[in-house]
């Protein structure tokens, strides 16, 4: 039977790489993004949607999944709290946290009913450390990690596997300005123990392993993949 994955943030970066690896391995992939449809080959279905708005079109379009990948996210330009408005804070939480809680509920209910399914959130090293973003980003990713762990505890007996992935510096469209002249790319690579940025395809490979069903005794881990950054 063909397995089905739903991926948010599918049009670029990590989400695009995730879609690619699952399609290559025969999965049916539903992808959501507010950007335009990516060029992917295989059993791919796309919905252009802002995840902070009405989600009912999603549930009509994709009614049941084996795997839910919460990959969409937003950054905050490393702003400290006194430079962050209430509106900006609420918007970042709407993307990074509340879109996850809202999208999870209907699919989780069905996973619990059939005693099967996997949910993976895209956390960050900022889910456990300061300095991986500004105050709004760090707070939203801490909240996401807490939600992930509690969800994993609450639904472990229902055989729903739940994980978080915590990347460090990943070379994506979101971080593209760091690679412009005068950007932070070289400094970040130099400060990373392995000497380079992580690539989206490496996150996708980890995701595929977690979704394989071969790690049945793992539950609730927030798995760091940051080139050794958090060892310092």
Located regions from the model:
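Residue(s) in the substrate-gating loop at a strand-loop-helix junction
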Residues: 124
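A conserved structural motif in NAD(P)-dependent oxidoreductases
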Residues: 192-203
């Amino acid at each position: 039977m063909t397995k089905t994955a739903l991926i948010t943030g599918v049009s670029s970066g990590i989400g695009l790489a995730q879609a690619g690896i699952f399609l290559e391995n025969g999965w049916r992939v539903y992808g959501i993004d507010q950007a335009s449809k990516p060029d992917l080959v295989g059993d791919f279905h796309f919905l252009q949607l802002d995840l902070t708005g009405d989600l009912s079109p999603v549930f009509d379009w994709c009614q049941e999944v084996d795997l839910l990948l919460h990959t969409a996210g937003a950054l905050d330009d490393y702003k400290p709290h006194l430079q962050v408005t209430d509106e900006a804070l609420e918007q970042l939480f709407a993307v990074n946290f509340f879109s996850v809680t809202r999208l999870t509920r209907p699919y989780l209910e069905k996973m619990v009913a059939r005693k099967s399914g996997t949910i993976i959130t895209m956390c960050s090293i900022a889910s456990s450390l300061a300095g991986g973003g500004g105050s709004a980003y760090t707070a939203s990713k801490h909240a996401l990690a807490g939600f992930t762990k509690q969800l994993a505890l609450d639904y472990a007996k229902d055989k729903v596997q739940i994980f978080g992935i915590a990347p460090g510096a990943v070379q994506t469209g979101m971080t593209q300005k760091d690679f412009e002249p005068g950007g932070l790319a070289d400094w970040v690579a130099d400060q990373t123990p392995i000497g380079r940025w992580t690539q989206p395809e490496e996150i996708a490979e980890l995701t595929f392993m977690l979704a394989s069903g071969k790690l049945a005794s793992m539950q609730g881990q927030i798995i760091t993949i940051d080139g050794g950054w958090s060892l310092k």
